[in-house]
Amino acid sequence: MRIIKFFFIFLVFVSFNANGNDVKNWLNKEIITIISAYQNNNLSNENKFLMIENTINNNFAGTGIAKFVAGKSWNGASKEVKLDYIKLFKRHLALNISSMMQGYSDQKYKLTNSSYDEKNKVTLIDMEIFSDTGSIQITWRVKKSKERFFVIDLLVADISLVVTKRSEFNSMLKTVDYDLGEFNNKLSSQNDLSYKKLIN
C-alpha cells in the first residue's frame, strides 16, 4: 500500500513539474513578445501598443475578468451592452498592462517559483524584476482551458490587478447607478485618454 501511495504522489509530482515547465515556457515567450515590442525602435508607439494589445487579448481571460469586475451591474445589462463593455474592458486591460510593462521593459527579469493551486486549478508563477534600486515581485495566475493557457490575474507586490479593478470600477459604477451602458461611455473616454498618453 505504501509503495502504491508513493508511486501516486510521484506521478502527481512529475505531472506538475512537466505542466509547470510548460506554463513557464509559454509565459516567458509572451513576456518576451511584449518587452521586445517596447525595445523595437523601428516600431511607432501606436504599432507597439497594437502588437501588445493583440498579445494580451489572445492570452488573458478578458471576458471572464470583465464579467467579474462588472459586479452586480452585469446582470441588469442587455447583451449588446455587455458585448460593448467586454470590448472596452479588454482595451482598458491592455492599456493598463502595457503601461506597466513599459516601465519594466529596460529591466532584467527572472521567472522564479511556480506552484499549483489544486483547489482552483490555477498555476502561480512568480516573476522577479530587477532594477538599480531593488526588485519587485509579480505573480501571474494562469489557468488551462481547452488545451490553452490563459492569464486570469496578475499580482504586483501581492496586490491583485483583478480585485483592484473590481474596486475601482465599483466606485465608478456607483456614480451611474450601476448602469453598465452609462458606464461604457465613461470607460470609452478613459480609454481614449490612456491611449493618447501611451502612444505620444
Q: What are these model-predicted stretches?
A:
Residues V156-N200:
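Low-complexity, intrinsically disordered terminal/linker segments enriched in charged
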Residues R2-I9:
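Sec-dependent signal peptide recognition
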Residues A18-V23, I199-N200:
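Short, low-structural-confidence N-terminal segments
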Residues F89, S115, I129-S131, V142-K144, ...:
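A mature extracytoplasmic/lumenal domain signature
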Residues D22-M101:
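Early exported N-terminus immediately downstream of N-terminal targeting peptides
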Residues L95-T139, Q190-N200:
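Surface-exposed, charged secondary-structure patches
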Residues F13-N17:
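N-terminal signal peptide c-region/cleavage motif recognized by signal peptidases
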Residues Q137-V163:
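Short beta-strand edge/turn micro-motifs at domain boundaries
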